[in-house]
């Protein structure tokens, strides 16, 4: 069988094997893993002499491991595995001159031995560490650890055991953690002294020998120190050995592998300081280890001092020392923060903080961002501590300036692009993203500094900005773009402090000292020669700052023309990233400064004319497999067009400034509209013939038209009176052409989803420009937007738009709504009735149901309910009621059910006539006359619905959403009672409630409560009543 297993492993691992044979081999090996006797064959294969191939042995041992972990090997058999492997280890690792296994096999054996340790150390293998330590001698009579093969294997197992039971980063179940804790306790009692002594012996005997042995020993000490007696590591013998290894840092040249030994020695000190202990003990430990001296000596070593700013700089060592600094300072700050710590301890901690400040600054200001990032946590802790101190005692804030100022200067300097940065290169996108993430973290630290000492922060940033602009004034384009970018970035962040009161100005004056400084900075920037901003990064920053602090221009309106001119130049930037961002920022700026801009419309339209030419491009076939959507990719054609739309809106804003006469507004609008109309006409024929690019071109044209309209007026129904927000009648008339052009395209191409999407977008924007002028066209819009192929999602979105139209024009829409309601709702009913397939479909169906009910509520709440029961729409009335009844009984969709009851209550209020029962307060009032027979209709059709939903088998009356639905159902019953009075009470008493099997006493309690409580009271009562019944 061994030969058969070996053969199967060879076939499975051979890339040239026949696929059928390989599949059979994999099936066989998978069966072997679950076979209770399979591990025995594999154990024999692994220990066989002469040995099998490395691959066979690796897979064989993997099967043994798998069987052991799956519980297929009982305790007695685990002992057998132990004995076989121990014999193998003694033969291969326990004597000199044998041929060692490759590292992957050694790791696999160490993994198996670690599992056996977990299972047997407390249950039959008490000599575990003695057995392993015996491998470290060449012979039983040897008194030194002189067998390198055995030592390396022993250390592999030691480190593997820590990973299994001591590594806090490993996620374990509660049972696994309890077992790990028990094993650690057992080791501490039985063997810990012996293990610690072995580390000392190995380090002592091999300190100048095998670097791998020393490195593995140091890693073992560093990992185990977190859960063993600290005295086993922090003693003179061990510390002398550790300091000897730290001495390697002083070497200018290291042999291969020696740097890992040095770094591992530093890591041991980091782990010692990271060990959990009382704050007082930790401070004493830091002082005892003289870590200030340790860090200082390594920092001044050739790899970190002489080689700094050269290609030989050792970033690995710098990061390793930075970890030690970070851990140490974090614990120093923790001691300072604890209120229970003694004054003497705090004094010591303060002293340590002062001596460690140069080390913090050294690594925080390191040229390499990964080194700087390593100490950010301790800098954050330190600054947060100082903020807490300053908050409790503001008078001491200035005392911390000796700490704050150098940290702040380091923060500012680290925010500068380094000399190797090449901004904007596609190849450097990852580096750029990482740098921006670092800037964000540094910005957070800077804000903490500002919170501790705002004046110090204000002075430091002001100095950087003022010096930079002065240098730019003197040297112009000679200024390094990185310095200007830094100053602008600091200006951008400064606003967090300058505008914390809510705005830059208060009654025309800067809102505080920081705001005053920011105004000074803005003046320096805006009055600078834009031509000095030669780098794309600084050009972008310039625009971002102008937009962020646009309120600055409210009191410096004379600067607006120059800024607009700068933006128009940058809108033509040769770099696409800058250009498209400029389009967006230009729109933001003119929107915020609309009331302060003079008549520059003609200049702007002429300057941007070449950028308003629309050129649709179909996505390339190669982009189909790209995981990133085209809209996310700033260089994609979709993203460029989306940015271009901002220009159309900006043009609309500038052309509709109130100071421009209406006839001029029309002229400017037509200068933009006409080329788009011509383009649509030119492409319509091809689009009808199925030309995909022509369809996309018309989609883009319609989107542009709608966006231009939004620029002229962003009024939305319901926000304010249209009379005060709509453009002049002449302008509205000009945009009627937009509506007509869009409808012509939509009517020709309504089978296209993209055209419907663009048209719906344009419709929503045109409402704000046309007002009630759009109403006569509503039937055409509905016909084009709600087709046989329209999705539920499209219908829901359009229903939402119609709600706005109804709200905005309720006094003018009745006749149009009366004419279009029946065909419109028939399409909605069709969409609701269509079968669903998949989760997305279910979501869209639920959304359509809710928007349909919202639409009915909009009609009823705006006194247009008569349209539902008009002579023209009467044939559809029963279908409307039936759909609502169906939704009200849906226990799978409580949100829709709740809305359905709301609609029925609103119908009752609208058509049930005047209230005849008392205590109907806090319900919706209505002045509408009664609909003949509707009262009886409510009793027989609406009332039973209140009981149908809770009668559903899956209904849970205690569910929070279910309670909300029941409250609405209770509200409906109270509405029926308010309209029908005793007639409804008698119906409940004589027919409905007894028909459900309710006893006479319960019926009387129920109808008595209904007649006694008001609407709010009964809404609360009904869910409680249903809970009682269900219990």
Curated annotation (Swiss-Prot):
Asked whether the UniProt record includes tRNA processing among its keywords, one would answer yes
Q: Where in the cell is it found?
A: Nucleus; Cytoplasm
Give the Pfam families listed for this entry.
Exportin-T, Xpo1
Q: Name the UniProt key words of this record, in alphabetical order.
A: Cytoplasm, Nucleus, RNA-binding, Transport, tRNA processing, tRNA-binding
The protein's GO terms of the molecular function aspect are: small GTPase binding; tRNA binding
Could you say which protein family the record assigns here? Belongs to the exportin family.
What's the name of the protein? Exportin-T
The organism is Emericella nidulans (strain FGSC A4 / ATCC 38163 / CBS 112.46 / NRRL 194 / M139) (Aspergillus nidulans)
